[in-house]
From Swiss-Prot:
Source organism superkingdom: Eukaryota
Lineage summary: Eukaryota, Fungi, Dikarya, Ascomycota, Saccharomycotina
Region (Disordered): 216-241
Protein name (Swiss-Prot/TrEMBL): U3 small nucleolar RNA-associated protein 6
Signal peptide, first to last residue: none
Length: 440
C-alpha cells in the first residue's frame, strides 16, 4: 500500500497542471487517478504479470495522446512548456523499468522498453539507453541479438564506429561459437567502409587530413550531449577469456588514404574477421561434437573433420553472398580471399582429395569470378576467354567424373546468364559464345 500511495502522490502536480491548463476536467482527472490506483494495486500484488504492465503502459499512452490532441485543439500549441508535457512519458518509462526489474527474463518486454526510449529521440538521453543495454547484457550476455542491437544503435544512430566495433568484439568473447554474430560484425565493417568511401567521393576528400577532420565532425554531429560521460559497461568474461580472439582488428585502426595505399579500404578488416571466424567456429564445432577428449578411432576423427569442413564451407558461402551486395567495393577481391582460404589444407584434409564436391564449388566460383558481375549487355569477350582458360586449366588436373560435373555446370552458367539473353541474329557475340560452349 505504501508503494501505491507514493507513486500516486507523484501524479498530483501533473493532474493539477492538466486541470489548470483546461485540458482535463476535475471529473476526468478523478477517473484517471482511479484507473491508476487500480493498476498500481495490480502491479504491487504478488500475482502481477507482465500483461498488467503492458496494459498500464497502453493506458498511459492513450492518456498522453488525448492530452496532446487537446493541447493542439484548445491551446493551439503542441507543447505548453509545463509539467504535463513530459510527466506522462516519464511515467511510462518508469513503468517499463519496474516491469524489467520484476520480470528480467522477458526479452519481448525489454525490446518494447528499448523501442519506446529510442522512439522518443532527443527526449531520451544517450546515457539512459546505455544503462538499459548494460542491464540487458549483464542479464543475457549469451543473447547475440542484444549485442547486435546495441552495436547497431552505436553506429546507425550515433555514427560511433569505434564503440560499435568494441561491442561486437566483446559480444564475441561471450559467444565465439555463434555464426550470426560474426556475420553481423563482418557486415558492419563492410557497411562502414562503403559509407566512408562514398562520403569521400561526394565531398571530394582526397588528403588524409581532410578525411580525418570529416570523420571527427560526423561523429561529433551525431554525438549526444551526455555521450562522452557514458560508456557501455560490458560484463566480464573472466581471466580465461582475456587472450581469446586477440587476432581481431583494433577499434582505432586507420581508415585514412585510399584503397591503393590502405588495404583496410578494400575490406581487409572484414577479411581478417572472416579468417578468425572460420578458425574459431571450426574449433568450437569440433569441441561441441566430440567433447574435450580425443577420439581414439581415427576413422571417426576423419569423419568429424569432414563434417566440420562442410559446416565451415556452408558458412563461407553466406559470406560470398554478402560480398555480392556491396557494389561499391572490389567484390571479386573479397571473394578471392575466401577462395584462397579454401586452398589451404585444414584438419589434415584437402578439399580436392577428401571433399571433391566442395572443391568443385570453389572451382566454379573461381572460373566465373572475372565475369560474375558482368550483365549480358557488358559481357567482354576478352574476360570471357580468360574465364574459359581457367576452366581448361582446372579440368586438366581433374578426374573424368569431376570434369563431367564441372563441364555441365559451367555450360549451364554461360547459357543461362548470357547465351539465352542474346539476340542470335543481331549480336555478334552470340556465335562466339555458342562456339565456346560447344568446345567445352
Amino acid at each position: 500500500m505504501s508503494k501505491t500511495r507514493y507513486y500516486l502522490e507523484q501524479c498530483i502536480p501533473e493532474m493539477d497542471d492538466l486541470v489548470e491548463k483546461g485540458l482535463f476536467t476535475k471529473n476526468e482527472v478523478s477517473l484517471i487517478m482511479k484507473k491508476r490506483t487500480d493498476f498500481e494495486h495490480r502491479l504491487n500484488s504478488r500475482g502481477s504479470s507482465i500483461n498488467d504492465y503492458i496494459k498500464y503502459i497502453n493506458y498511459e499512452s492513450n492518456v498522453n495522446k488525448l492530452r496532446a490532441k487537446r493541447c493542439k485543439r484548445i491551446l493551439q500549441v503542441k507543447k505548453t512548456n509545463s509539467l504535463s508535457d513530459w510527466s506522462i512519458q516519464q511515467r511510462i518509462g518508469f513503468i517499463y523499468q519496474r516491469g524489467t526489474n520484476k520480470f528480467p527474463q522477458d526479452l519481448k518486454f525489454w525490446a518494447m522498453y528499448l523501442n519506446y526510449m529510442k522512439a522518443r529521440g532527443n527526449q531520451t538521453s544517450y546515457k539512459k539507453i546505455h544503462n538499459i543495454y548494460n542491464q540487458l547484457l549483464k542479464l543475457h550476455p549469451t543473447n547475440v541479438d542484444i549485442w547486435i542491437s546495441c552495436a547497431k544503435y552505436e553506429y546507425e544512430v550515433h555514427a560511433n564506429f569505434k564503440s560499435c566495433r568494441n561491442i561486437f568484439q566483446n559480444g564475441l568473447r561471450f559467444n565465439p561459437d555463434v555464426p550470426k554474430l560474426w556475420y553481423e560484425y563482418v557486415k558492419f565493417e563492410l557497411n562502414f567502409i562503403t559509407k566512408l568511401i562514398n562520403r569521400r567521393k561526394v565531398m571530394g576528400l582526397i588528403n588524409e587530413r581532410e578525411q580525418e577532420l570529416d570523420m571527427q565532425n560526423e561523429q561529433k554531429n551525431n554525438q549526444a550531449p551526455d555521450e562522452e560521460k557514458s560508456h557501455l559497461q560490458v560484463p566480464s568474461t573472466g581471466d580465461s577469456m582475456k587472450d581469446k580472439l586477440n587476432e581481431l582488428p583494433e577499434a582505432d585502426i586507420s581508415v585514412l588514404g585510399n584503397a591503393e595505399t590502405n588495404p583496410a579500404l578494400r575490406g581487409d578488416i572484414a577479411l581478417t574477421i572472416f579468417d578468425v571466424c572460420m578458425k574459431t567456429l571450426g574449433k568450437h564445432y569440433i569441441n561441441k561434437h566430440k567433447g574435450y577428449y580425443a577420439i581414439s578411432d581415427s576413422k571417426m576423427n576423419i569423419e568429424l573433420n569432414k563434417e566440420t569442413l562442410n559446416y565451415l564451407f556452408s558458412e563461407s558461402l553466406r559470406y560470398i553472398k554478402l560480398f555480392d551486395e556491396f557494389l561499391d567495393l572490389e567484390r571479386d577481391y573479397l571473394i578471392n580471399h575466401v577462395l584462397q582460404f579454401w586452398k589451404n589444407d585444414m584438419y589434415d584434409l584437402s578439399l580436392r582429395k577428401d571433399l571433391p564436391e566442395l572443391y568443385l564449388k570453389t572451382v566454379m566460383i573461381d572460373i566465373t569470378l572475372n565475369i560474375r558481375y558482368m550483365p549480358v549487355e557488358k559481357l567482354d569477350i576478352d574476360q570471357l576467354q580468360l574465364s574459359v582458360k581457367k576452366y581448361f586449366a582446372y579440368i586438366s588436373k581433374l578426374d573424368s567424373a569431376s570434369v563431367k560435373s564441372l563441364k555441365n555446370e559451367y555450360r549451364s552458367y554461360l547459357q543461362d546468364n548470357y547465351l539465352k539473353k542474346m539476340n542470335a541474329e543481331d549480336d555478334p557475340r552470340y556465335k562466339i559464345l555458342d562456339l565456346i560452349i560447344s568446345k567445352l
